[in-house]
């Protein structure tokens, strides 16, 4: 089983990645992946997309048909359009309910696997030291702070270790972002080909020099 030290670090890394990427972006990606699976919701989504295409096609046909010169054809297209539109709205409403339930489940899992798990570990292991400090290495006042609130004196508590992990992960993420921006700005740029005006101007300049 991984040590408590590693578990807390992983929780903060995952939390930072979620906050950096964006919870809504992750939810949308998971929803798209969920629709790729063979389930009832994916079938509803396929049917909804099919009905949407059919509604758009019927709308184009109605616009291309004169309601005065070809009234019978236009009326038939209108009835098909209205019926298909009702089916589309029903499927769209059902799909919206599925997505709301899916988003709630994803948010619940994300909360309990990050913030909820972190709070539980801090409560359950509040008296458990993450690691011990060498005796006499630092003043006892600092030892008391590092063991706050309930870990034995001379050790590092899970609360303090969690704060250290959050700070280090955030600084590391910012440093990676700065390096990425620096490397991107230093990337070699392709030279733009000379325009015809520039090419024609060069021979003229040479002739003048001669």
Curated annotation (Swiss-Prot):
Transmembrane helix as UniProt keyword: yes
Source organism superkingdom: Eukaryota
Record localization: Endoplasmic reticulum membrane
Transmembrane residue ranges: 5-24, 111-131, 156-172
Topological domains, Lumenal: 1-4, 132-155
One biological process term in Gene Ontology: tail-anchored membrane protein insertion into ER membrane
GO CC, any one term: endoplasmic reticulum membrane
Segments of this protein annotated with the region Disordered: 189-210
GO molecular function: protein-membrane adaptor activity
Coiled-coil blocks: 39-95
Keywords noted in UniProt: Coiled coil, Endoplasmic reticulum, Membrane, Transmembrane, Transmembrane helix, Transport
Residue ranges, Cytoplasmic side: 25-110, 173-210
Keyword Transport: yes
Membrane topology category: Multi-pass membrane protein
PANTHER family the UniProt entry points to: GUIDED ENTRY OF TAIL-ANCHORED PROTEINS FACTOR 1 (PTHR42650:SF1), TAIL-ANCHORED PROTEIN INSERTION RECEPTOR WRB (PTHR42650)
Family classification: Belongs to the WRB/GET1 family.
HAMAP family: Get1 (MF_03113)
Function: Required for the post-translational delivery of tail-anchored (TA) proteins to the endoplasmic reticulum. Acts as a membrane receptor for soluble GET3, which recognizes and selectively binds the transmembrane domain of TA proteins in the cytosol.
Subunit and partners: Interacts with GET3.
Designated name of the protein: Protein GET1
Organism: Coccidioides posadasii (strain C735)
Designated gene of the protein: GET1
């Amino acid at each position: 089983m991984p040590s408590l030290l590693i578990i807390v670090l992983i929780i903060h890394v995952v939390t930072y990645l979620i906050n950096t990427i964006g919870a809504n972006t992750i939810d949308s990606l998971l929803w798209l992946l969920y629709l790729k699976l063979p389930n009832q919701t994916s079938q509803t989504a396929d049917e909804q997309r099919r009905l949407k295409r059919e509604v758009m096609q019927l709308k184009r046909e109605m616009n291309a048909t004169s309601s005065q010169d070809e009234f019978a054809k236009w009326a038939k297209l209108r009835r098909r359009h209205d019926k298909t539109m009702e089916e589309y709205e029903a499927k769209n409403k059902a799909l919206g309910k599925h997505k709301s339930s899916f988003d709630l489940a994803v948010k619940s899992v994300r909360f309990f696997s990050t913030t909820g798990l972190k709070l539980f570990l801090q409560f359950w292991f509040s008296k458990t030291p993450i690691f011990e400090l060498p005796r006499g290495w630092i003043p006892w006042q600092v030892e008391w702070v590092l063991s706050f609130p309930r870990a034995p004196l001379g050790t590092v508590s899970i609360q303090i270790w969690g704060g250290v992990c959050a700070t280090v992960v955030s600084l590391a993420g910012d440093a990676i972002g700065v390096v990425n921006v620096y490397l991107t700005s230093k990337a070699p740029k392709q030279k733009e080909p000379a325009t015809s005006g520039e090419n024609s101007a060069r021979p003229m300049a040479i002739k003048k020099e001669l």
